[in-house]
Amino acid sequence: MQITDVRVRKIAAEGKMKAIVSVTFDNEFVVHDIKVIEGQNGLFIAMPSRKTPDGEYKDIAHPINTETREKIQKSIIEEYERAKMEEESSEKVQE
């Protein structure tokens, strides 16, 4: 399964959640609402989740193995960094 598109849909300057991302696989399947989070050890992703009645969060969709998670995370963080740099450079042009 190949990652064929990563779209950074929202970038936040405040708080720990830095972006919301959609990832397309094989031009056939998309997963929305993957979050880019800033943690103590740098950026990581949080897969889309829902809150259970007892207050616990459960992933709706997630990679089954570490290799796939790392591949998805690497692609998302690279695209987030690129989008963030583009946004910052366009803000400088407007000033």
From Swiss-Prot:
Family of the protein in this entry: Belongs to the SpoVG family.
UniProt KW keywords: Cell cycle, Cell division, Septation
Entry protein name: Putative septation protein SpoVG
UniProt record, GO biological process: division septum assembly; sporulation resulting in formation of a cellular spore
Species, as recorded: Clostridium botulinum (strain Hall / ATCC 3502 / NCTC 13319 / Type A)
Top-level taxonomic group: Bacteria
InterPro entries referenced in this protein's UniProt entry, alphabetically: SpoVG, SpoVG_sf
Free-text function comment from the UniProt entry: Could be involved in septation.
